[in-house]
């Protein structure tokens, strides 16, 4: 995963990802700097009351989330093709057109693909693409991926977020967990490959990075 994070930003030229990922993140203005576009890019939200009128400021962005969303959907399609090939495999085996070892190999590949899909989706659904904070600094909006590789926004109270200074996480690590006191959600962000756009508002939610680096 760390290798992917190093390679993806280098491959992202001005047109490298624009066409195949046209339904992903795109600019839309200051309050909501990223949104979904295109008819094939559903955008779901776990809304909190009153969020429609809130103004949000972007405090963190992980640009490689576009490539990871594409990879998630590609893996989903590959797994579907592998699983769909099982019934024809059983038919060919029953007709004597396939050996038992070939059928077992096909079943093993399908099982491995399913296991990898579950593992990757478990992580990708918790990987943070963008973080927003409202004007009053009381509500955190987390943009992450769904199982299908599309964007989903989750709203969390800032007062429920555990500061990194109170957790056991090391900010120097590739991935850092951000958790809630209520234990409802756990997300992962990468301070090494992501970009903090508003350090002041970020520090209000997660603590000052200089203090965190010196304390770990």
UniProtKB/Swiss-Prot annotation:
The chain crosses the membrane at residues 69-91, 104-124. One of its GO terms (cellular component) is mitochondrial inner membrane. Residues 1-68, 125-216 are mitochondrial matrix. It comes from the Eukaryota. Disulfide bonds: none annotated. Its main location: mitochondrion. InterPro entries: Tmem186. The keyword Transport does not apply. Keywords: Membrane, Mitochondrion, Mitochondrion inner membrane, Transmembrane, Transmembrane helix. As part of the MCIA complex, required for efficient assembly of the mitochondrial complex I. Belongs to the TMEM186 family. This is Transmembrane protein 186. The gene is Tmem186.
């Amino acid at each position: 995963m760390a290798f992917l994070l190093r390679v993806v930003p280098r491959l992202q030229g001005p047109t490298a990802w624009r066409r195949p990922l046209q339904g992903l993140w795109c600019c839309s203005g200051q309050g909501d700097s990223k949104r979904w576009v295109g008819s094939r890019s559903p955008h779901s939200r776990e809304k909190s009351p009153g969020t429609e009128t809130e103004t949000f400021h972007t405090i963190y962005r992980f640009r490689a989330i576009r490539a990871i969303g594409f990879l998630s959907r590609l893996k989903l399609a590959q797994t579907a093709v592998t699983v769909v090939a099982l019934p024809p495999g059983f038919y060919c085996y029953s007709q004597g057109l396939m050996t038992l070892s070939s059928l077992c190999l096909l079943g093993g590949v399908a099982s491995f693909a399913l296991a990898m899909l579950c593992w990757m989706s478990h992580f990708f659904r918790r990987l943070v693409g963008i973080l927003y904070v409202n004007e009053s600094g009381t509500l955190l909006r987390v943009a992450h991926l769904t199982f299908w590789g599309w964007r989903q926004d989750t709203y969390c109270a800032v007062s429920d977020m555990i500061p990194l200074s109170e957790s056991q996480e090391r900010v120097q690590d590739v991935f850092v967990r951000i958790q809630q006191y209520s234990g409802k959600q756990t997300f992962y962000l990468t301070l090494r490959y992501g970009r903090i756009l508003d350090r002041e508002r970020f520090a209000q939610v997660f603590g000052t990075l200089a203090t965190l680096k010196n304390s770990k």
